[in-house]
Amino acid sequence: MRTSKKLPIVIAIISALLPASVFAQENINISQEQLEKLISQAVDKALAERDAKTTVQQSKADPITVEHKSVATPAVAPSPDMTIPYGFKFSAYARYGAHYQAGDEKYVSVDGSYNGSSGIGRLGNQGYGGEYSLIKTFKGENGAIWDANVMIEHWSDELNLKKAYVGVTNLFESQPNSYLWAGRDFHQRPSQEINDYMWMNHDGQGAGIKNFNINGILFDVGAVGSVESCDPKVVKAGDNPSRITCTGGSDTGDKGNYAVTSKIHGMKLGILDVAAYANYGFDSKAIDSDERKHAWQGALVLSHTTDHSMNQLISRYSDNSDNSVYNKTNGLHSTYISFDGMYTFNPHAMVRYLVAYQDYDNSKNPEDSRKNYAAIVRPMYYWNDIHSTWLEAGWQQVRYDEGGTNKGWKLTLSQNISFAMGPDFRPMLRFYVTGGQVDNQHTALITDTEDTRLDSLNVGAMWEVWF
């Protein structure tokens, strides 16, 4: 009954909007479904005609600027961001917390270690700080993709400008993936996770190119200078009310120590991935002539990755230097060999591990010559995608060529709350206890002391994040 009352009105609307052929039949029998469909079509047509009329009216009202280009206000140029995301990107790595010392050492550390306290294991055994970056990416009309980077670091009582560089990729048609950069950057700092060791480090300012492709082999080449550090001094009262020349952080110029660095990667040797490094260090005339030195180093890295494991073997030799050709020592020959990796038993259980050897041979100062041996293992169990328990055990021994051995062990139990399941997911809250013992016999011999043993017990709560 309600449908029959509405029918004349509907027919009137439809007859005004639809062609007459629709009603060619003498009898009209319309079901509820057909009726709703016709109403929908009619409404859509009416709205379309209304929009068309509105557009015509607006076009008549708007001033025509096509014929007056010479006097029209130019439109704002389109952003070069074009099809890539872009605005500013904020990224960071940081760790902060409380670390309570209840024993002899705040951080378990063997004297003469190749990497300080982290040489015996970093979990629950390292200081706090962070690195904070702002990155802006652009895409030019020619297709080149640019990025401008700035990083501030906080690892002491001051802030330092650690990165300030610009890079570009997709610049050369023949080398779309090559990356050309210039400025101040974290440069050539390959590292290991479980001992937090940068077995090469050439942070500085200069220029270079990465991923230059020659027949499938990738080349990285750079020329960089060590950044000058400011030496804080108290000066006479004058224009400087603080009477301090600087805070002791990074300066803006070069120090006078330079490095030419190179890396070849993207190579395969059977199932192994191969990477090779070669670096040369030298000094400018900013360094006194009797202090100028040369140094070089080379390294080979063999790595292999499967569905359940990641492993790498690192071999590095340095002449007149250790892990950086910036810092040169006449007569020093340093060899570093290490094997590290991770094995995943199942999504809930995995283990990281490392063994390392360093031969620090100083022919000009033989009493400083020593050999480092270290082993670290960290089994990890994930109860679910939030909670996990880690146990890290570390051992280290430093044998001096002349007189005595320093040695130690460390054990850390850590209960974690993390962003997701897995060793590389952050943010993470960590609650840990670390115990250990160090026996510095060599140190006691050269300092003429009797008490060589240091016992440690430390408790901490911290957070760690990277993104």
Protein language model annotation of sequence segments:
Residues 25-175, 180, 212, 342, ...:
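Beta-barrel outer-membrane channel/assembly domains of diderm bacteria
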Residues 96-102, 152-156, 184-188, 223-229, ...:
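Transmembrane beta-strands of outer-membrane beta-barrel pores
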Residues 119-123, 153-157, 193-198, 247-253, ...:
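Outer-membrane beta-barrel domain signature
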Residues 257-400, 407-411:
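Detector for outer-membrane/organellar transmembrane beta-barrel domains
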